[in-house]
């Protein structure tokens, strides 16, 4: 389908004598103006510089046209602007704003890398390098909040939660997951909440096969996060929240050894229903009166 182009738009304002005219007929035009803000944020955080330092460039130096940092920036900013497929590189090669995000002159700068170059770059990254990349992202997030809160936090809550990432095709390690009723990956997502703030901050994601158990990779991730968080916030208490898929003596032992407060969901059973009988009746009455879902909290002793 042909693209409909608007060559000119005129804006009339009540309190202005002259109209404002916007024209779109320049050769160096782009639809991704938000990329400039992302570039400014990256300049402040120096994130892509740090990520590039995690990668080893094994290419012949005499044949390099695009540095590792340039390739990384091109891919990251492209993804952030909605260009998931490396095939988009062909039409973005001379986009002025995408060249600007890489650090090139938006008009006279050299064209960006092609799809084959980006594909070779992605496939050359080793598992060890991927670990270093994830660790660098997590440390950048922690350092940002350490600066924001001046290293002072009374309580930090770590939420660990598996989620589905549906797949479409023959990607490696994609499996059918009965709980989500789809073929997918099952990444483990970690977020941080500081003190009584309502915002949850993404700090790490571990990509896993679609049939992974909920706890797969969680122990190592939790230990790494606690190590860095305790160094950044030495006076903080820690709370870990996980759902029922983590319930089990092995995981509870890990939480005890890490000396953290924890909240673990449990699958319903006859004994728990009996213990919660009075509270369930109270919640039912409140819900019937209000017409909304109501939450009632209580405590009990329970040993499986």
PLM region spans:
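A short acidic (Asp/Glu
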Residues: 169, 248-254, 273-277
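A conserved hydrophobic secondary-structure block that centers on an alpha-helix together
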Residues: 228-229, 234-242
């Amino acid at each position: 389908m042909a693209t409909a182009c608007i060559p000119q738009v005129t804006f009339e304002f009540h309190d202005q004598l002259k109209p404002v005219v916007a024209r779109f007929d320049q050769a160096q035009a782009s639809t991704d103006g938000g990329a400039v803000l992302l570039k400014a944020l990256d300049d402040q955080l120096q994130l892509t510089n740090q990520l590039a330092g995690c990668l080893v460039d094994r290419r012949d130096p005499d044949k390099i046209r695009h540095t590792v940092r340039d390739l990384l920036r091109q891919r990251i900013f492209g993804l952030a602007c909605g260009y998931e497929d490396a095939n988009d590189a062909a039409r973005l090669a001379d986009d002025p704003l995408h060249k600007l995000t890489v650090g090139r002159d938006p008009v006279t700068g050299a064209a960006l890398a092609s799809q084959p170059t980006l594909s070779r770059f992605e496939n050359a990254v080793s598992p060890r390098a991927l670990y270093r990349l994830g660790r660098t992202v997590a440390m950048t997030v922690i350092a940002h909040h350490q600066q924001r809160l001046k290293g002072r936090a009374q309580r930090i809550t770590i939420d660990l939660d598996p989620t589905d990432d549906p797949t479409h095709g023959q990607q490696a390690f994609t499996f059918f997951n009965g709980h989500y009723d789809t073929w997918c990956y099952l990444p483990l997502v970690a977020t941080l909440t500081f003190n009584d703030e309502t915002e949850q901050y993404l700090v790490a994601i571990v990509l896993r096969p679609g049939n992974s158990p909920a706890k797969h990779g969680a122990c190592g991730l939790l230990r790494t996060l606690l190590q860095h968080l305790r160094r950044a916030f030495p006076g903080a208490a820690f709370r870990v929240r996980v759902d029922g898929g983590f319930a089990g003596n092995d995981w509870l032992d890990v939480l005890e050894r890490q000396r953290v407060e924890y909240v673990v969901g449990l699958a319903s059973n006859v004994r728990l229903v009996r213990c919660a009988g009075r509270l369930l009746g109270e919640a039912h009455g409140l819900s019937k009166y209000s017409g909304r879902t109501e939450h009632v909290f209580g405590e009990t002793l329970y040993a499986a």
